[in-house]
């Protein structure tokens, strides 16, 4: 299982890299769970990240606006992101989600067919009226994405496991794999959750708070020693 760590700036990215993160995921918590950062920040982080490490970027907790989000995804891709993550926040059903993600996939793959597109749902979707989380693997498959992901929409201390059981998450992972997709899981993940995620076959575990001093995703800063501890648990 590989470790994705989400810095907000270059200094945090350097700490994540020093700690052994496998994917450097550029985000902006001020704009939400999958809040988008600026193109110049993606570019700057790509420049300090070793070539053998992949950079990911979120394009936001997005509304149902396929044109707008396709354009945002292209911005992330040309700024240097290898993974482009889209949070299915404002889409209400399977059909809207597939339409949105199909257009993102087309836009991104036109830039570079090796770019990786991630459809991200929310384990607590009912709290924000987002698309049902357990159909995300099917959405990802039918839209031509590469990765199906779950996160949490509201960052209030509740974790992925407060909304989905280990058994349900295992089914999510297995379904994604059956479609030939990778599976990423995140959502206020704590150290003690990592062995469980590894056991159920998760490909990528995403963290921010667990890698920050004080466990605070908003006010804490990523610390290389915390990243090292998380990385060891992923091996």
Swiss-Prot record:
Pathway: Cofactor biosynthesis; methanofuran biosynthesis. Keywords: Lyase, Schiff base. It comes from the Archaea. Optimum pH is 7.0. One of its GO terms (biological process) is methanofuran biosynthetic process. Catalyzes the formation of 4-(hydroxymethyl)-2-furancarboxaldehyde phosphate (4-HFC-P) from two molecules of glyceraldehyde-3-P (GA-3-P). This is (5-formylfuran-3-yl)methyl phosphate synthase. The gene is mfnB.
């Amino acid at each position: 299982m590989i470790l994705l760590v989400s810095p907000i700036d270059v200094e945090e990215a350097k700490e994540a890299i020093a700690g052994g993160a496998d994917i450097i995921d550029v985000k902006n918590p001020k704009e939400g769970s999958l809040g988008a950062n600026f193109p110049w920040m993606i570019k700057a982080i790509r420049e300090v990240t070793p070539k053998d490490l992949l950079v990911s970027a979120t394009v936001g907790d997005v509304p149902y606006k396929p044109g707008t989000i396709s354009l945002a995804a292209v911005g992330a891709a040309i700024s240097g992101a290898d993974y482009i993550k889209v949070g299915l926040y404002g889409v209400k059903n399977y059909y809207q989600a597939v339409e949105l993600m199909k257009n993102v996939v087309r836009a991104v793959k036109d830039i570079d067919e090796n770019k990786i597109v991630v459809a991200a749902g929310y384990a607590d979707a009912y709290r924000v009226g987002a698309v049902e989380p357990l159909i995300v693997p099917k959405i990802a498959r039918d839209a031509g994405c590469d990765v199906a992901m779950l996160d949490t929409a509201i960052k209030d201390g509740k974790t992925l496991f407060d909304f989905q059981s280990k058994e349900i998450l295992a089914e999510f992972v297995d379904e994604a794999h059956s479609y030939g997709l990778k599976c990423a899981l995140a959502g206020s993940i704590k150290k003690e959750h990592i062995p469980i995620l590894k056991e159920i076959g998760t490909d990528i575990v995403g963290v921010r708070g667990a890698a920050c001093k004080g466990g605070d995703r908003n006010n804490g800063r990523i610390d290389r020693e915390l990243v090292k501890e998380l990385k060891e648990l992923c091996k």
